[in-house]
């Protein structure tokens, strides 16, 4: 009986050592690859919309895209930043490596209210996700370049981008913001220092 208890304690001890060693290895890999990255980027550099970003990220700001011929807005954009991004940006005016920005794009509905004509988010169209990459980790992936990973996701599939080339599919909208690292920082009050 004593031998069985000693064997059981020995097996438990070895199991704990193996588990700690495995955790250390996983922790080292996560540190090397950046745990922020794993929430949004796979090993091949493919992006996806991060889980629970509405509750774990910080609201950066929102935009209303004016309707072409009528009052109100045709789209509303709501932008979130991964934890720590705002504080890091406010310290030195740069987005930190691994920062994730998620832009929700909604079709807007417009109607009269007691305060006047009002637009509100109606139907999700999709997401635009950007990941700061100051080290050029995915140079062979056409969705990465100019310091960022870039991808658009339709509302029905937050795991698979419809973007194929950031220069053709994404960057043209950001050209006016080239001088501020491709981001329209003036529209985001939390970034003001």
Region locations from a protein language model:
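N-terminal module-boundary/linker segments of secreted carbohydrate-active enzymes
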Residues: 36-50
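Signal peptide processing junction and immediate N-terminal pro/mature segment
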Residues: 18-28
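Sequence context surrounding c-type heme c attachment/ligation sites in exported
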Residues: 26-33, 41, 53-62, 66, ...
């Amino acid at each position: 009986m004593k031998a069985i208890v000693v064997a059981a304690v020995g097996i438990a001890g070895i199991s704990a050592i193996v588990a700690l060693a495995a955790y250390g290895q996983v922790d080292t890999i996560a540190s090397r690859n950046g745990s922020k990255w794993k929430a949004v980027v796979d090993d091949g550099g493919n992006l996806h919309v991060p889980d629970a970003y509405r509750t774990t990220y910080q609201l950066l700001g929102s935009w209303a895209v004016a309707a072409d011929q009528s009052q109100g807005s045709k789209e509303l954009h709501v932008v979130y930043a991964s934890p720590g991004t705002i504080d890091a940006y406010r310290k030195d005016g740069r987005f930190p490596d691994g920062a994730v920005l998620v832009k929700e794009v909604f079709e807007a509905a417009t109607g009269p209210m007691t305060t006047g004509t009002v637009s509100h988010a109606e139907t999700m169209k999709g997401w635009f996700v950007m990941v700061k990459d100051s080290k050029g980790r995915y140079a062979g992936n056409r969705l990465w370049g100019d310091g960022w990973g870039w991808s658009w996701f339709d509302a029905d599939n937050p795991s698979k981008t419809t973007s194929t080339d950031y220069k053709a599919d994404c960057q043209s909208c950001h050209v006016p913001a080239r001088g501020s690292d491709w981001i329209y920082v003036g529209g985001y009050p939390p970034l003001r220092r």
